[in-house]
Amino acid sequence: MTMLLEEIVQSVELWLKLIKKPQPYVDPNLDPVLLVPGIAGSIMNAVDDENGTEERVWVRILGADYKFRTKLWSRFDPSTGKTVSLDPKARIVVPEGRYGLEAIDALDPDMVIGQECVYYFHDMIVEFTKWGFQEGKTLFGFGYDFRQSNRLQETLDRLAEKLEAVYNAAGGKKINIITHSMGGLLVKCFMCLHTDVFEKYVKNWIAIAAPFQGAPGYITSTFLNGMSFVDGWEQNFFISKWSMHQLLIECPSVYELMACLDFHWEHIPLLEMWRQRLDGDGNSQIILESYPLAESVEIFKEALSSNTVNYNGEDLPLPFNMEILKWANETRKIISRAKVPPQVKFYNIYGINLETPHSVCYGNEEIPVTDLRQLRYFQPNYVCVDGDGTVPAESAKADGLNAAARVGVPGEHRGILCEHHVFRILKCWLKADHDPFYNPLNDYVILPTAFEMEKHKDKGVEVTSLKEEWEIISQDQDHDHDDKVAADERPMVSSISVSDVGAEACATVTVHPQNEGKQHVELNALSVSVDA
């Protein structure tokens, strides 16, 4: 019955054109939010330093794999800690449009059909604007070159500048940072290395699906047979699996996502292989060999010892990079020392209830691994644990920080960014017109005991009445003529009715003549329902 009355009210509002062109809702009391993506989550453009032309190289449809190989393939420079594009003329930049949101919204803005497959923060941005956040005032984004180390000074300097800019744009309000995936490692590095800046500008940090202790299963398979860290995105991004592998093998960020050696795993992540060996009597036998984290590095080295990439007709060696591993190990030491400043609150949301790769096994008893350099052609088999399908929950919730709250949410690694459960939690923590009775730790809403609604019910018949009024203010500045014309007019009366099985609602709408630029509208509605 209430629904029938709502339909009547909406019909009248549409008729009066009160909601034909709604103005975006803006809440001036909200604190600013900065969204920080994870690996592969930023649009990247290549600038030709010779002629100044700029083109998108991640993500694109036409010529995607070719541009990816010619512009994004890179080599690590241990003297600077930076990975540099093989093309000496190409300079990789991240677009700053829409206050940084352009780079992290839809990763291919030109894709019209099926664009949702390359959405990143899109759904969250749409949801936030409904809550009253405004781009450039209280909503911002920070895209970055995800190939680089999470402690690259160039990236950290950009983040410091961004925080200051957001702080100033919001009128001196402190910032809520929301990170996804590897973005959590970037912010944790920044918090450790630039504690004073972090404390000055940040109010809350909310990490979502962050691989704080690594993503063992996916990173192992990334090194050995080219599976992308973000499972399933390759086919959407039109990049071959091996082209992605040849990029990631020189990316410090990927090495920084390896499983942490000093973390006390419930089950140690293993690299396992079925191998053909000779016993003491010289007889051949097939055995399962297991390598813990430290020992698996030797397997990576041997498996990638002959790996090359052909660039401009020249074969360049691309082995497992021990220099990057050293750099990544130092990054992990820095991250482990991070502490949340006393005035900042930290929250952690992590994905659960999905099979998530943890240990990886190659070969089987019928087809053992005979040559490690052929591992790229083997299909990995995973031993899975609970998580978001990419990051184990054990890793994501082990942030090592003083957290105000940690909440596990059923969801997939990327899809968790559009989960309404997550939106409810964020709305509460951001104080965006949140329900004071909502508890994000158990996702329950406790309703107040008092509930006021006028009803009359007798012998199975329920009657509900409704009265609503509007006042329309004309945009026309010349009201005198209209007032004279309307002086002798009578109010216009119309009726509306809506019916359903066992229920009926009717209403009378009275539109009074305009007076001094204002027009008064009254709605009186009555609904009657009969118990079935």
Where are these regions (language model features)?
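A broad, low-specificity signal for short, low-complexity segments enriched in glycine/proline
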Residues: S305-N312, P368
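Extended, loop-rich substrate-binding clefts of extracytoplasmic carbohydrate-active enzymes
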Residues: E298, L304-S305
